[in-house]
UniProtKB/Swiss-Prot annotation:
Protein name per the record: UPF0473 protein BC_4380
Protein family (similarity comment): Belongs to the UPF0473 family.
InterPro entries the record matches: UPF0473
Lineage: Bacteria, Bacillati, Bacillota, Bacilli, Bacillales
NCBIfam families listed in its UniProt record: PRK13678.1-3 (NF010216)
Amino acid sequence: MEERQITIVDEKGNEHLCEIIFTFDADKFGKKSYVIFSPIGEVDEDGDPIYDAMAYEQNEEEGGVLLPIESEEEWEMVQETFNTIADEQEAE
């Protein structure tokens, strides 16, 4: 994914403009790509940014299709990757 923003539609049909934090590929749950994003202007109760993730497939016709993360183990892998990259960026 080359654009730095995406629009996510929630289960109620509301659109949320989100900043792409980073993307990565992983083979652990089949060859998948993942996107970590943060809804622009939305924060949690402590005022910290909200982060979320989805799998995605590149698609020439649509540009890309977002897919749900399917299992707790897959979420844990995404969370570990996010934490590792966040720690590396803090160290810089």
